[in-house]
Swiss-Prot record:
PANTHER family associated with the record: 30S/40S RIBOSOMAL PROTEIN S3 (PTHR11760), SMALL RIBOSOMAL SUBUNIT PROTEIN US3C (PTHR11760:SF42)
Protein name as annotated: Small ribosomal subunit protein uS3c
Keyword rRNA processing part of the UniProt annotation: no
Region (Disordered): 50-74
Subcellular location: Plastid, Chloroplast
Gene: rps3
Chain ranges of the KH type-2 domain: 43-139
Entries under Pfam families matching the protein: Ribosomal_S3_C (PF00189)
One GO process term, biological-process aspect: translation
Keywords (A to Z) from UniProt: Chloroplast, Plastid, Ribonucleoprotein, Ribosomal protein, RNA-binding, rRNA-binding
InterPro entries in UniProt: KH_dom-like_a/b, KH_sf_prok-type, Ribosomal_S3_C_sf, Ribosomal_uS3_bac-typ, Ribosomal_uS3_C, Ribosomal_uS3_CS
Subunit organization: Part of the 30S ribosomal subunit.
GO molecular function, one term: structural constituent of ribosome
Keyword Endoplasmic reticulum found: no
Length: 239
């Protein structure tokens, strides 16, 4: 029986790279991993805490003239909706944190970075190390599976049909520089008692080709009927 491996880990070292860059003694390695998790969780919690409740942001779709009203009200299940990934680089006295984000409006506010650095300093409680945080805006947000998954989550929470939500998400990738995309949703779709899985695919998706650059994410969506699982594969290019 065939086993499904994570597409990102399968390509680590070829088309995918590590998100943490540091060296440590073997006995201190576990502490470094726990520290990385604390840093990432602290950043996600900061964004969730400082998000204005009920404020709306309009995102103009690249694929059509449709303007999507994107509700910024957050719940406990979607604290990192606009962060694609966080890179951590550790030196002797400095921890460099690079936040790759699709819509960095919140972190562009005056004093936001300084406040986040103070929160991280308290969380890690490291006297000899200081934090250096930088923000990198993703050039093509709808080329990122995390952002597409969050968009689908927003649609489903607003009682939009799951098939319509998947089709709209694929439409957003039309003008992005990609060669294939697949969206899969599993769970009690439409409130049915029996769980099932539905998927839509467009273009190529060579999962067994290691040199193929494929982005992937798995995203849980909490609804009144239970938790739905969204998986998105995006075939960017082939090296």
């Amino acid at each position: 029986m065939g086993q499904k491996i994570n597409p990102l880990g399968f390509r680590l070292g070829t088309t995918q790279k590590h998100h943490s860059f540091w060296f440590a003694q073997p006995k201190n390695y576990s502490e470094g991993l726990q520290e990385d998790k604390k840093i990432r969780d602290c950043i996600k919690n900061y964004i969730q805490k400082n998000r204005k409740k009920g404020s709306n942001r309009k995102i103009e779709s690249d694929s059509s003239s449709e303007v999507i009203t994107h509700n910024r009200k957050m719940d406990s299940g979607s604290s990192s909706e606009v962060i694609t990934h966080i890179e951590i680089q550790k030196e002797i006295d400095t921890i460099h944190v690079i936040i790759h984000i699709g819509f960095p409006n919140l972190l562009k506010k005056k004093g936001a970075i300084e406040e986040l650095e103070k929160d991280l300093q308290k969380e890690i409680n490291s006297v000899n190390q200081r934090f250096n945080i930088s923000i990198e805006k993703v050039k093509e947000p709808y080329r990122q599976p995390n952002i597409l998954a969050e968009y689908i989550a927003f649609q489903l929470k607003n009682r939009v049909s799951f098939r319509k939500a998947m089709k709209k998400a694929i439409e957003l990738t039309k003008k992005a520089d990609i060669r294939g995309v697949k969206v899969k949703i599993a769970g009690r779709l439409g409130g049915k008692e029996i769980a099932r899985a539905e998927s839509i695919k467009k273009g190529r998706l060579p999962l067994q080709t290691i040199r193929a650059k494929i982005d992937y994410c798995c995203y849980p969506i909490r609804t009144i009927y239970g938790v739905l699982g969204v998986k998105i594969w995006i075939f960017v290019d082939e090296e």
